């Protein structure tokens, strides 16, 4: 089994953690933006079927 030879420094660990958090926050922002555009009907990437009223 692979074992690291030396301990990872605190600064390197913090940098990697911030990159990981940044990717998550970016994905959440994109998901929120897509949800907003779908709810307002301004989405250009999704086609949502409109319900037809029979009355």
From Swiss-Prot:
<keyword id="KW-0687">Ribonucleoprotein</keyword>
<dbReference type="InterPro" id="IPR044958">
    <property type="entry name" value="Ribosomal_bL32_plant/cyanobact"/>
</dbReference>
<dbReference type="GO" id="GO:0009507">
    <property type="term" value="C:chloroplast"/>
</dbReference>
<dbReference type="GO" id="GO:0003735">
    <property type="term" value="F:structural constituent of ribosome"/>
</dbReference>
<dbReference type="GO" id="GO:0006412">
    <property type="term" value="P:translation"/>
</dbReference>
<keyword id="KW-0150">Chloroplast</keyword>
<dbReference type="GO" id="GO:0015934">
    <property type="term" value="C:large ribosomal subunit"/>
</dbReference>
<dbReference type="InterPro" id="IPR002677">
    <property type="entry name" value="Ribosomal_bL32"/>
</dbReference>
<dbReference type="InterPro" id="IPR011332">
    <property type="entry name" value="Ribosomal_zn-bd"/>
</dbReference>
<comment type="similarity">
    <text>Belongs to the bacterial ribosomal protein bL32 family.</text>
</comment>
<dbReference type="Pfam" id="PF01783">
    <property type="entry name" value="Ribosomal_L32p"/>
</dbReference>
<protein>
    <recommendedName>
        <fullName>Large ribosomal subunit protein bL32c</fullName>
    </recommendedName>
</protein>
<keyword id="KW-0689">Ribosomal protein</keyword>
<keyword id="KW-0934">Plastid</keyword>
């Amino acid at each position: 089994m692979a074992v690291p030879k030396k301990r990872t420094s605190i600064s390197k660990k913090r940098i990697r953690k911030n990159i990981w958090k940044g990717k998550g926050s970016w994905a959440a922002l994109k998901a929120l933006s897509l949800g907003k555009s779908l709810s307002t009907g301004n989405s250009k990437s999704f086609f949502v079927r409109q319900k037809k009223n029979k009355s």
